[in-house]
Amino acid sequence: MRRMLVIRWILAIHLIATQVFAERIKDIATLAGVRVNQLVGYGLVVGLSGTGDKTGTKFTEDSFANMLTQLGINVPPGVRLNSKNIAAVMVTANLSSFMKKGQTMDVNISSIGDSKSLLGGTLLLTPLKGADGRVYAMSQGNVVVSGISASGSDGSSVTVNVPSGGRIPNGATIEADIPNPFYYSNSLTYNLHTPDFTTAKRMSDAINELMGPGTAKAIDAGSVVVTAPKKLSQRVDYVSVLENIEFKPGEAMAKIIINARTGTVVISSNVIVKSAAVSHGNLVVSITETPVISQPNAFASGRTVATQQSQVNIQQKNNRAFILPKGTTLKDIVRGINAVGATPADVISILEALQQAGALSATLIVI
């Protein structure tokens, strides 16, 4: 009995240890077809207090005239419409995969003309289309603007935030469902956020261990295909179990990311440096301009002249060298570079030189 208890404790400790670095499938992979779909439309915002598109903005005038014609109001040819209270806008929205007909979503409104502000405006009925050209939603409502603009008679103006754009909370109603392979496909495909052969293999093994052999198969470094239940009513429970399966992903490639503009350096924990010696020195060049006045003697037929005398001084700082032995890790790299008082710019130079020397076992990426 005691022996069995000890064995159970050992197994429990082993399971805890193996799950310390484990991650859920839902955190590192996305189910194919479950995505956000972008919608876009062109519309008119009316009711502006003289802050709309200026007279002469042709596409706004044409859109206004077409709208009046559709409402049964004839606009005589050649008549120019005053559009100071109207602005042409683009309407955008993100439609989630499982949102249904009749639900509402937020929309963003952005001026495309020379309107100064959309404050107080109302978006007229605007169809929102997907990439396939189909209408998936209709949008209309009062525009909420967080910015404000004011101008004086002398031409001075003050602008806070961006008044030429705004939002309509729940401003679009969904009119059509997005086709989704989740409902009709015989299999489910998980796409890894970061493609990796080891992660894909371990993920398929973890699924097969719980769901049965042959359930999942890694088809490449970025995708794992899982057999789906034929009954649609079982798929929700099935995916709920799948996405909570935990396993240990493969270690990422050793990388060093450098932002040359900001001096930011990010080094992954598995970066290894081969044996190398580093010495990084600095040349400080200073040029000083000193004015010199040349003044002639009294009663002499000369004039006072001011000239510049330049003094150039070059000073080299004697920085210490440090040695990176074979198998040096991230901690040793940071300690060694800090020991010589290197700045972020110096760190970038040192890392680039180490890679050129073949002593850096990592991919160096400069952004």
Curated annotation (Swiss-Prot):
GO cellular component, as recorded: bacterial-type flagellum basal body, distal rod, P ring; outer membrane-bounded periplasmic space
Pfam families referenced in this protein's UniProt entry, alphabetically: FlgI
Cellular compartment(s): Periplasm; Bacterial flagellum basal body
Signal peptide positions on this chain: 1-22
InterPro entries on file: Flag_FlgI
Example GO molecular function: structural molecule activity
UniProt keywords, alphabetically: Bacterial flagellum, Periplasm, Signal
Record GO biological process: bacterial-type flagellum-dependent cell motility
PANTHER family in the cross-refs: FLAGELLAR P-RING PERIPLASMIC PROTEIN FLGI, FLAGELLAR P-RING PROTEIN
Function description: Assembles around the rod to form the L-ring and probably protects the motor/basal body from shearing forces during rotation.
Family as reported in the entry's similarity comment: Belongs to the FlgI family.
Quaternary structure annotation from Swiss-Prot or TrEMBL: The basal body constitutes a major portion of the flagellar organelle and consists of four rings (L,P,S, and M) mounted on a central rod.
Protein name: Flagellar P-ring protein
Species of origin: Legionella pneumophila (strain Corby)
